A protein has these predicted regions:
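Helical segment within the ABC ATPase nucleotide-binding domain
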Residues: 171-183
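Conserved catalytic motifs of ABC-family nucleotide-binding domains
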Residues: 152
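Conserved ABC ATPase "signature" region
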Residues: 98, 102, 109-127
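Catalytic Walker B motif of ABC-type/P-loop ATPase nucleotide-binding domains
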Residues: 156-160
Length: 255
């Protein structure tokens, strides 16, 4: 069974293509890394898959549901951590999670219980009563992940979850995500520029370039005998040569 399937998914902005004829196949239980250069169409794709942006053409099924027919049902069953963190700065971490759970229909006692468990799992229990505005960027990323998990989604969308956070925070988030997939708790669809981290996490990879899917499949098949970075560079055709000139850099005295 596929957690995500698209056929001919296309999005134009003012007549210009952002995503073209996308045919994604994300197996249930997979940790799927969706990669591409800046401006390749990753965020546009994620917005379409989460019901935040209507496609110009094509179809998408998420958890077996046709997005065009029942986007609200999909939104109830997925969790999303967007690139921009939309948190209430004047709430405490515990309040943020509890209220988020209640917005998904959880009773207050259950939302409170889940919030406490998530804070512990995310190593934020000691900061549960601090205002979100006093959290570091890495702590806010963890809290946003907790908000995406509190209602028990079957599919988790993560847009650049490791961007701008330190190695300790990355390690904690990575361990939690790996455990969720290993336990069969959910499917994860992730975009990231940090290929080294992605390579240690994902089971499947899709690479998008200039709005088109150029590579897709299990990680081992995509990277073949090389690294994911090497496969990525081959797929997007943007291997860089050493810059020419600049011989004046490093001179001790002006001439």
């Amino acid at each position: 069974m596929l957690a995500i399937e698209t056929r001919g998914l296309t999005r134009l902005f003012d007549g210009r293509p952002a995503v073209v004829d996308l045919a994604l196949e994300v197996p249930s239980g997979a940790f799927y890394g969706f990669l591409g250069p800046n401006g390749a169409g990753k965020s546009t794709t994620m917005k379409m898959l989460t019901g935040l942006l209507a496609p110009t053409a094509g179809q998408a099924w998420v958890l077996g549901v046709d997005l065009a027919r029942d986007a609200l049902s999909v939104k109830r069953r997925v969790g999303v951590v967007p690139d921009g963190l939309n948190l209430f700065e004047r709430l405490t971490g515990a309040e943020q999670l509890r209220i988020h759970g209640q917005l998904y229909g959880l009773a207050r006692p259950e939302a409170t219980r889940r919030a406490a468990e998530l804070l512990a799992a995310l190593e934020l229990a000691g900061d549960a009563d601090r205002l979100v505005q006093d959290y570091s960027h890495g702590m806010k990323k963890k809290l946003a992940l907790g908000c995406a998990l509190i209602h028990g989604p079957r599919l988790l969308f993560l847009d650049e979850p490791f961007e701008g956070i330190d190695a300790v925070a990355v390690s904690g988030i990575r361990s939690l995500l790996q455990d969720l997939v290993a336990r069969g708790a959910m499917t994860i669809f992730l975009t990231s520029h940090v290929l080294e981290v992605v390579e240690r996490l994902v089971t499947h990879v899709g690479i998008i370039h200039r709005g088109r899917l150029v590579v897709q499949g299990p990680l081992d098949a995509v990277r073949a005998s090389g690294t994911l970075e090497e496969s990525f560079i081959r797929a997007v055709g943007e291997e860089r040569t050493a810059p020419q000139g600049l011989s004046w850099l490093g001179r001790t005295e002006p001439t």
